């Protein structure tokens, strides 16, 4: 009996094997990952009917401004889709995602081209992102460039395309995309750069705003950039062919 009790105590005192710990850790990771995806899915479903109050990018910028520029606050005003100039809508589609209305949120050729450029450079320098992919990143993710983040971006893109129509995706994009240092959304950008409303933006103004999107903070500080002016002319010529979601 004494021998049996000794064996029992030894068994209780034995450490859990590394393989079992790995299994436990893997199970916790899978559960956490699934819970995160369900949260994203539910949040997107709600945003079909309720406008997002903020995005991951906005919250990050608001915190940065509170630390670096406490006298400056985030500029953001939501306006309905119908109150945003068709000029701006056409300019953004012409500049960022010419096939927005007809694609499923992905442009395979652009993704493959970005992959080749990244492989050649040995780091992520391009993402081949559509408007829906950009929105996925803005809403939930960070500015970090990694393959893990890109994978999550693609999953959220699928959720957006599954749960929302193109007009709603574009409406949220127009109201949440970054346009400068602490400037978010079409209405805030129109007021900040041109002292007008998003509804009254001209073709020229819209083309400039569209060109700023890939590097909004840079162009906020370099508004007289020759590239900005030249590229805006190109986008202005392409705007007429841009197809809008209706």
UniProtKB/Swiss-Prot annotation:
Transmembrane feature ranges: 27-47
Membrane topology: Single-pass membrane protein
Keywords of this entry: Cell inner membrane, Cell membrane, Cell shape, Cell wall biogenesis/degradation, Glycosyltransferase, Membrane, Peptidoglycan synthesis, Transferase, Transmembrane, Transmembrane helix
Catalytic activity field: [GlcNAc-(1->4)-Mur2Ac(oyl-L-Ala-gamma-D-Glu-L-Lys-D-Ala-D-Ala)](n)-di-trans,octa-cis-undecaprenyl diphosphate + beta-D-GlcNAc-(1->4)-Mur2Ac(oyl-L-Ala-gamma-D-Glu-L-Lys-D-Ala-D-Ala)-di-trans,octa-cis-undecaprenyl diphosphate = [GlcNAc-(1->4)-Mur2Ac(oyl-L-Ala-gamma-D-Glu-L-Lys-D-Ala-D-Ala)](n+1)-di-trans,octa-cis-undecaprenyl diphosphate + di-trans,octa-cis-undecaprenyl diphosphate + H(+)
Signal peptide residue numbers: none
Disulfide bond entries: none
One GO term of the biological process aspect: peptidoglycan biosynthetic process
Tagged with keyword Phosphoprotein: no
Pfam families: Transgly
GO molecular function: pentosyltransferase activity; peptidoglycan glycosyltransferase activity
UniProt cross-references to InterPro entries, sorted A to Z: Glyco_trans_51, Lysozyme-like_dom_sf, PBP_transglycosylase, Pep_trsgly
Subcellular localization: Cell inner membrane
GO cellular component: peptidoglycan-based cell wall; plasma membrane
Broad class of where this protein is predominantly found: membrane
Record-linked HAMAP family: PGT_MtgA
Protein name: Biosynthetic peptidoglycan transglycosylase
Species lineage: Bacteria, Pseudomonadati, Pseudomonadota, Betaproteobacteria, Burkholderiales
Gene name of the record: mtgA
């Amino acid at each position: 009996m004494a021998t049996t009790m000794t064996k029992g105590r030894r068994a209780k005192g034995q450490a859990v094997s590394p393989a079992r710990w790995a299994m436990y850790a893997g199970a916790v990771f899978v559960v956490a990952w699934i819970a995160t995806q369900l949260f994203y899915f539910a949040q997107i479903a709600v945003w079909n009917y309720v406008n997002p109050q903020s995005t991951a990018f906005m919250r990050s910028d608001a915190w940065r401004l509170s630390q670096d520029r406490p006298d400056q606050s985030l500029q953001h005003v939501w306006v309905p889709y119908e109150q945003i100039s068709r000029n701006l809508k056409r300019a953004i589609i012409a500049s960022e995602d010419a096939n927005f209305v007809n694609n499923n949120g992905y442009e395979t050729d652009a993704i493959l081209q970005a992959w080749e450029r990244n492989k050649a450079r040995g780091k992520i320098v391009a993402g081949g992102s559509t408007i829906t992919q950009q929105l996925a990143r803005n809403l939930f993710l960070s500015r970090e460039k990694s393959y893990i983040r890109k994978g999550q971006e693609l999953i959220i893109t699928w959720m957006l395309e599954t749960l929302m129509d193109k007009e709603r995706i574009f409406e949220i994009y127009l109201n949440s995309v970054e346009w400068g240092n602490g400037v978010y959304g079409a209405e805030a950008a129109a007021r900040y750069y041109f002292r007008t409303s998003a509804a009254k933006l001209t073709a020229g103004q819209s083309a400039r705003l569209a060109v700023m999107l890939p590097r909004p903070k840079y162009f906020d500080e370099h508004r007289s950039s020759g590239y900005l002016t030249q590229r805006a002319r190109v986008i202005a010529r392409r705007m007429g062919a841009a197809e809008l979601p209706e």
